[in-house]
Structure formats: C-alpha cells, structure tokens
Amino acid sequence: MSEKIYLGFDMGMGAAKLWGKPGGLQVVSQVANNGRGHLSDGIVGLRNRKRPMLVTGEFGSFYVGDGAHEHGRPVENLDFDRLTGAPEMRVLLYAALAQYEDEHGPFDDLLSLMVGLPLQMMTGDSAKDFQKGVRRWLMGTHQFDVDGISHIVQVEEVRQTSQPVGALFDYVLDDEGQMIGGRGSTLLDEVGVISVGFNTVELLVVKERGAVERFTAGNTVGVRRLLELINREGLWSLGELDSRLRAGRLNGEVKAALPIWSREVNGEIEKRWGLSHRRFAKVLVVGGGALLLKEALTLQFGHKAFVPNDPVLSIARGLWKLSVMKK
C-alpha cells in the first residue's frame, strides 16, 4: 500500500500555509477577480510588473498572492464561512499546492491534510457544521490550472484541530513526530498559546493534554486591526496594506499605531487570563503578528515566553508534526 503524503494546512486569513516533510511555504491571502483587461507589455517609460499567479477552474478565474489586488478587483472576505469552500479559499489552497509541487516535485500519492482552524470554528453551536463544511470541500479530487498548467490533486484524508494546537505540537514534537527531550512534560503542565494572526488573536491553555476552557478564547483584534488603525480613511484594501507592511513600507505608520494595537491585544489577554499566566510553565507566541508584538509580549511574560524560529509557519509545521505522530 502506498504511503500517504502528510501536509499541515494552516487556514490563516493573512496567508494560506502548507508544511510537509521537505519544508513549508505560504501564499499571501490576496485574491482578485481576473478582469482580463490587461495592459500590454512594453509601455515605454513604465516598468513591466510581474503578474501574480492566475488560478482557473470551474470556480472561476482569479489572481492570487502578493500584488493580486493591483491586477484585478479585490475579493476580501474575512468571515469564517469563507473557510468552508468559498472560491477565494479554494484558489489560495490551489496556489499553495501548485507552488509546493514546483518546489518539491509533483504529488505521487494521495494527500492527508491536518487542517488548523480558528478557535471560533471549533467551539459553539455551529462548530460541527463548520467542520463538516471544511471537510466536504477538501476531500476528494481537485482539478485546477495555475498559470496555464493543469493540476489534479487527490485528498484522501482530512483531520481538523484548532490553530493554536498546531503551535503547541510544533514546540513539543520533532520532525519524526517524537517528543523533544525535556518538552514532553510540558503537555502535563499548564501551557499558554497566543496566536496573533491576520484576523484574530487566539488564546489557548492546555493542561494534561486537554484545553482549559476558561482560558481559551478568540477575538478579531489581529493584524487587520493594526491595518485598520493605519487606514482610517479607507484608501487601501487590507491586502494592499498587508503587502506594504511585509515590504517594510509602513514603518512610520506602524510606529504610530503599534502602541494602540498592542494595548488592545494586551487588554484581550488580560481579560481572559488575568494574573493566572504567572502559573503557566510556558507561553508560546506564534503567528505573523508575533513578529510585531514580540517585544511587548516577551516583556509581559518574561522568561516564560517562547517565540519559535519561524512564528509565521509554526502552526502549519506543528500540524504536520501532529499528523506524522497520529498516522
């Protein structure tokens, strides 16, 4: 029997992230309708701009990735329903899968996905419906074209957990799915996880391998909130601002808005954890926003704070490690 290919898939609102045995990648969550009214190349005096990936199929035709909002009409939807199979979520995954194949070779076996979802989709009355919707669109055969190249990918297995759980297992597991020496006992202690994503800041506390519900929550004060503080007049799409932020072209604006956003995030943490964090063995800080808030959060939690070497891809990497352990 052939070996399945295990992938961790972090369904982030800021980027779709994949991690497998050879490594990982992210595709920035910019999606735009392909208007097909392109400027011709070679306009004298203007530099030709590289187009983002073009993903097409029965779902439509979309530009995907960094710069997509400059080439078509932006599609920005931060509702959780998008993760249950909206066209913009499909094309993000397809772009990521195509890029993964470009970098590591074509998939020669069926895929097994360990999917990380926002905490809000894993709790509450709608949790089962959300999870069924995610599984429904991910399972089976996927046919799509990326930049004119046809792809067929088959997903045989879909398993789901919360995104902060991925961060926890990235910390305690090695690449073989085995406990890292000295960290296995962490699962018995109380460990806090702060995931600062594009849309949400999620808090999870685990004790004896189970979630402590009163310390677990998610709120929409992620990096988008910082961008909203910068973009009060609404002159830019969130995707355009995100690109400028990643390129280091918002340093002045970020310097002015960061203290406000930092206080809002700290307020949400304080509201849920209070002083109880002092008893936690570790506080893991992950997500793209961890790079922006690293100084503030490490100051708040002192030596207990742990920021991984790649906080952006930590969740996807941990999801992959978990899938290897559970195979």
Task: Annotate the PLM regions.
Residues E190-I194, N199-V205:
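Conserved active-site beta-strand-loop modules that form the wall/rim of enzyme catalytic pockets
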Residues V223-W261:
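A mobile "lid/hinge" subdomain adjacent to the ATP/sugar-phosphate binding pocket shared
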Residues E202-S237:
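Glycine/GP-enriched mid-protein hinge/lid loop-to-helix segment characteristic of carbohydrate kinases
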Residues M1-V191, E213-V223, N251-K282, G288-K327:
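Nucleotide/phosphate-binding catalytic cleft detector across ATP-hydrolyzing
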Residues N199-E202, L241, V265-G267:
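Short hydrophobic/aromatic-rich motifs at helix boundaries and adjacent loops
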